[in-house]
């Protein structure tokens, strides 16, 4: 399958072969601990989650969606090329769709003990993977993209989260809710355990808001100079042409509430690779700002995040 390589160099480049060799080694030894350290490189010191006003400015820049008469009547009079972010509402989740990558930017869910109750006759075996016809065909992920690719069609909003009706279950099998994931050791194991952990949170918390999405993260490679080079490499799926990129990582964020409106936050980033089931979930715990910086998103901007407790101080963060 096609491979995409993207490199951003802070200094003069080293040889391509050396960089590729180092990159492959880095990917093999990449762990949650190193991931957290890498993320901190991308979090600017001026970004302070304790200042809601700064978050408001990030989410609502001064000129956002504001066009002058000249722009509308002159430069864009023949049309606005985009980008377009399709916001799709389903029975059990909402997603923002990335037309370039044929993946979701994010998928959002609101889990409660009541929402996880199974409706009569709901059966996963009745559901089938489907292309999402709400997405224009040229920007759509196709069933044939995944055939013999070596990757699973990994749910972002899990099927087990949407048991209220067969329709809700079926909607989780739309390809807009999928991303290429390593099967054995990840999608079928550790990632599934993480999904179960999110559902289990409803036993101790009134509401659980979950956001999930893909990430494409670079690795640092030594150049022998003061500043490193950052490189990224990932394959594309596609029956005839490259169509769906394979994320290097995935994030999952949980914001829980109690009856007294106390918030607790947990943010995790996992590499898209087999993970030993004994690996502590806390190895993949990161600061929320790290995900925001990497994904270009801002979460929970209507809340004072300085009041969020650490989820792992309120419950045991572990998968099983």
UniProtKB/Swiss-Prot annotation:
Recorded GO MF terms: metal ion binding; nucleic acid binding; RNA endonuclease activity; single-stranded DNA endodeoxyribonuclease activity
Cellular compartment(s): Secreted
InterPro entries attached to this UniProt entry: DNA/RNA_endonuclease_AS (IPR018524), DNA/RNA_non-sp_Endonuclease_sf (IPR044929), Endo_G_ENPP1-like_dom (IPR001604), ENPP1-3/EXOG-like_nuc-like (IPR020821), His-Me_finger_sf (IPR044925), Non-specific_endonuclease (IPR040255)
Glycan-linked positions: 204
Gene3D superfamilies attached to this UniProt entry: Extracellular Endonuclease, subunit A
EC number: 3.1.30.-
Gene Ontology terms: biological process: apoptotic DNA fragmentation
Keyword terms of this UniProt record: Disulfide bond, Endonuclease, Glycoprotein, Hydrolase, Magnesium, Manganese, Metal-binding, Nuclease, Secreted, Signal
Active site per database record: 155 (proton acceptor)
Broadest EC class assigned to this enzyme: hydrolase
Disulfide bonds: 312-317
GO annotation, cellular component aspect: extracellular region; mitochondrial inner membrane; nucleus
Required cofactor names: Mg(2+); Mn(2+)
Annotated residues for binding of Mg(2+): 187
Pfam families assigned to the protein according to its UniProt record, in alphabetical order: Endonuclease_NS (PF01223)
PROSITE patterns to which the protein is assigned, alphabetical: NUCLEASE_NON_SPEC
Post-translational note: Glycosylated.
Task of the protein: This enzyme has both RNase and DNase activity.
Other known facts: The active site contains 1 hydrated divalent metal cation that has only 1 direct interaction with the protein; all other interactions are via water molecules.
Subunit structure of this chain's protein: Homodimer; as a result of non-covalent interactions and not through the disulfide linkages between the two monomers.
Family, per entry: Belongs to the DNA/RNA non-specific endonuclease family.
Name of the protein described by the UniProt record: Nuclease
Source organism (scientific name): Syncephalastrum racemosum (Filamentous fungus)
């Amino acid at each position: 399958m096609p491979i995409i390589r993207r490199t951003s160099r802070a200094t003069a480049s080293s040889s391509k072969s050396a960089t590729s060799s180092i990159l492959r080694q880095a990917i093999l030894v990449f762990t949650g601990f190193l991931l957290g350290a890498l993320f901190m490189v991308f979090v600017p010191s001026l970004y302070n989650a304790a200042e809601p006003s700064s978050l408001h400015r990030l989410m609502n820049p001064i000129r956002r969606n504001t066009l002058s008469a000249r722009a509308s009547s002159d430069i864009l009079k023949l049309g606005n090329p985009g980008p377009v972010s399709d916001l799709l509402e389903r029975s059990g989740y909402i997603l923002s769709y990335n037309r370039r990558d044929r993946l979701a930017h994010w998928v959002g869910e609101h889990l409660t003990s009541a929402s996880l109750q199974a409706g009569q006759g709901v059966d996963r075996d009745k559901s089938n993977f489907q292309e999402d016809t709400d997405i224009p065909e040229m920007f759509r992920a196709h069933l044939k993209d995944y055939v013999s690719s070596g990757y699973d069609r990994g749910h972002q909003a899990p099927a087990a989260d949407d048991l209220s009706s067969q329709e809700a279950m079926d909607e989780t099998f739309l390809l807009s809710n999928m991303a290429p994931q390593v099967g054995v050791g990840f999608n079928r194991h550790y990632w599934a355990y993480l999904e179960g952990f999110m559902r289990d949170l409803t036993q101790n918390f009134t509401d659980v808001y979950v956001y999930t999405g893909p990430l494409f993260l670079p690795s640092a490679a030594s150049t022998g100079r003061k500043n490193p080079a950052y490189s990224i490499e990932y394959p594309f799926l596609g029956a005839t042409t490259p169509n769906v990129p394979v994320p290097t990582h995935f994030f999952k964020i949980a914001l829980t509430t109690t009856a007294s409106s106390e918030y607790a936050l947990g943010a995790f980033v996992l590499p898209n690779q087999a993970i030993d089931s004994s690996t502590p979930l806390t190895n993949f715990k990161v600061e929320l700002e790290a995900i925001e910086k990497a994904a270009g998103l801002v979460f929970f901007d209507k809340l004072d995040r300085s009041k969020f407790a650490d989820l792992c101080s309120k419950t045991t963060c572990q998968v099983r």
